[in-house]
C-alpha cells in the first residue's frame, strides 16, 4: 500500500495548481470526505467525467464572478469621480446678467487712489509692467499720511450715499422689475437644467447597471448565451471595419498634408527669390533717380522753372513728358537739350 502511494502521481488536472486552488476547486465540486486518503480521492475523482465537467463549470462561474466584481469596482470609481463635480474642461461659464440701467456702483477710497495715481505713474514710467505698478501703488497707499488718505475715504463715503439714494429710486422703476423677473426666470431655468442633467445621469447609470446585470445573468452554453456571443462578435467585426476605414482616411489625409507642406515650402522659396529681386530693382531705381536728378538739374521746366530733386524727380519727368508732347514746335531748343542729356545717359 505504501509503495502504491509513493509511486502514484497526481493527474495533469492538479499538477499546476497550488494548495489554495486545490482547496477551492474541491470545495466547488462538493467533495466533503476529508477522511478519505488523498491519493485514492484524487484518482477516483479524475476518473469520473462528471467531476471534471463540474470543476470546469465552477472555474467559469468563479471567473465570471471575479469579472463582475471588477466591473462593479470600476463603476463605483466612476460614480465617485462624477460626484466630485468640478467645471469640465472646454466649457464656458455664462456671464451673469448685468443691469445696464442700474446706478453705478460706488468706489472705495483705495480704488479711487489707485485710479488717480495709476495713470500718473504709467505716464512717468511706461516701462514698468502693470502688476509692478499695482504693487508700488499698494505700498504708496500704506505709507500715505492719514490726512491725505482721509480725503479719498470722504469721497468714497459721499459716493456711497449717492449710490444708495439712486438705488432706492431705481428700485421703484419699471426697469428694475423687468430685470428682477429676468433674473428669477434664469435661476428657474438653471435649476431645471441641473435637475434634468442629474436625472439623465441617474437613468444612464441605471441602464448600464441593468445591462451589465443582464449580461452576467446569462447561463453559459445556452442558446441565449450563443446569440449574445454572436452579437458581440458582429459588433467587433463592425468596429474593426470602421477602424480600418478611419486608418485609410488618416493615411490619405497624411499624404495630403505632406503635399501641402511641400507646396508651402516651394512658395516660401519663391517669395524669398522675389524679395531679393525686388531689392535689386529698388536699388537700380534709386540709382536711376540720382542720375536723372544730376543730369536734369540745370534744365528748369519751361513756364514753371522747376528743377528736379531726388524726391521730386518722378513728377518732374512726368511734366517734362507732357510739355514735349503738348507743344513740340514751341520748345524745339528745350527738346534738343533733353535729347543730348538722354544720349549722354545711354553712353
Swiss-Prot record:
Ubiquitous. Residues 72-82, 182-211 have a biased composition (Basic and acidic residues). The keyword Transcription applies. Residues 1-10, 40-49 have a biased composition (Polar residues). Its main location: nucleus. Pfam families: HMG_box (PF00505). Plays a role in neuronal differentiation as chromatin-associated protein. Acts as inhibitor of HMG20B. Overcomes the repressive effects of the neuronal silencer REST and induces the activation of neuronal-specific genes. Involved in the recruitment of the histone methyltransferase KMT2A/MLL1 and consequent increased methylation of histone H3 lysine 4. Interacts with DTNB. This is High mobility group protein 20A. It comes from Homo sapiens. The gene is HMG20A.
Amino acid at each position: 500500500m505504501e509503495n502504491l502511494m509513493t509511486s502514484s502521481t497526481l493527474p495533469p488536472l492538479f499538477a499546476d495548481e497550488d494548495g489554495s486552488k486545490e482547496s477551492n476547486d474541491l470545495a466547488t465540486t462538493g467533495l466533503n470526505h476529508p477522511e478519505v486518503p488523498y491519493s485514492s480521492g484524487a484518482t477516483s475523482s479524475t476518473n469520473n467525467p462528471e467531476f471534471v465537467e463540474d470543476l470546469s463549470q465552477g472555474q467559469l462561474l468563479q471567473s465570471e464572478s471575479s469579472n463582475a466584481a471588477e466591473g462593479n469596482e470600476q463603476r463605483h470609481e466612476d460614480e465617485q469621480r462624477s460626484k466630485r463635480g468640478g467645471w469640465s474642461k472646454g466649457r464656458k461659464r455664462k456671464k451673469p446678467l448685468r443691469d445696464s440701467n442700474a446706478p453705478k456702483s460706488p468706489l472705495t477710497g483705495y480704488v479711487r487712489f489707485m485710479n488717480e495715481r495709476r495713470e500718473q505713474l504709467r505716464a512717468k514710467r511706461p516701462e514698468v509692467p502693470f502688476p509692478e505698478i499695482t504693487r508700488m501703488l499698494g505700498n504708496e497707499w500704506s505709507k500715505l499720511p492719514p490726512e491725505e488718505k482721509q480725503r479719498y475715504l470722504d469721497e468714497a463715503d459721499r459716493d456711497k450715499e449717492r449710490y444708495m439714494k439712486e438705488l432706492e429710486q431705481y428700485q421703484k422703476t419699471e426697469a428694475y422689475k423687468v430685470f428682477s423677473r429676468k433674473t428669477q426666470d434664469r435661476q428657474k431655468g438653471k435649476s431645471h437644467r441641473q435637475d434634468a442633467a442629474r436625472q439623465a445621469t441617474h437613468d444612464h447609470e441605471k441602464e448600464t447597471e441593468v445591462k451589465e446585470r443582464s449580461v452576467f445573468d446569462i447561463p453559459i452554453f445556452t442558446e441565449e448565451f450563443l446569440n449574445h456571443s454572436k452579437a458581440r462578435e458582429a459588433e467587433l467585426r463592425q468596429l474593426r471595419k470602421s477602424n480600418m476605414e478611419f486608418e485609410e482616411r488618416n493615411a490619405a489625409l497624411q499624404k495630403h498634408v505632406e503635399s501641402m507642406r511641400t507646396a508651402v515650402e516651394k512658395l516660401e522659396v519663391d517669395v524669398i527669390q522675389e524679395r531679393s529681386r525686388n531689392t535689386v530693382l529698388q536699388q537700380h531705381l534709386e540709382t536711376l533717380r540720382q542720375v536723372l536728378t544730376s543730369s536734369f538739374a540745370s534744365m528748369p521746366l519751361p513756364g514753371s522753372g522747376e528743377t528736379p530733386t531726388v524726391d521730386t524727380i518722378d513728377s518732374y519727368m512726368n511734366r517734362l513728358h507732357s510739355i514735349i508732347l503738348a507743344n513740340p514746335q514751341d520748345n524745339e531748343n528745350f527738346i534738343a537739350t533733353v535729347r543730348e542729356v538722354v544720349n549722354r545717359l545711354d553712353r
